[in-house]
Amino acid sequence: MLLRFASFLLLIVLGLANPALAQSRLDVGAMGSSIDLAPYLQQLTTEKPEVMVELPRDATGKVGVIALKSSRSVPSYHWRILTLVNTGKIPKNLIVVIDHQKFAGSRLLYPLNPGSVVASIAHTGSVAPARISALGQDAYSLVLEPSANLSLGLEMTGTAPSALLWERDAFDSLSRSIAFFRGAILGVAVLLSV
């Protein structure tokens, strides 16, 4: 019991003492159905609408650069940068999901506006991530070939409640389940109102 507690405290201390984790690359080759992106998102705040950001080194030791260009005019720009790499042998069909700001998760005084928190998206590579329809979320579909890298820069209008990376099949299955549940609730509500 004491050994478990000591190892738990050691994990907490090591987790707090490693600020470089946010600038690491996320390997999606052996990923499960979903993963929380919070530890892998590099945060950048700047007053310039256009900025070049250095990315983490790839497997060959090269350092890449991503160009971030804002789509709006504000006093300061908030970006979240994510680098994905596929070390697996098969292409990965992935969905990056950022929850919308909801009124319930807002502040008491001067509440935040509900809705999308992603103003624009920048990427490396030739194929832009496609925006897909998702209820209460900003979702972007991308395919990562074997041995490929992809970096995304998300311009944020506020703090994202959560950000997840999903495999496409798992995301579609969850979306269908939620749609069925919402339909069942709506059907019961209609029957009760009659």
Show the residue positions of the predicted features.
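Small-residue packing motifs within transmembrane alpha-helices
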Residues: 11, 149, 183-185
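Soluble non-transmembrane domains of integral membrane proteins
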Residues: 23-178
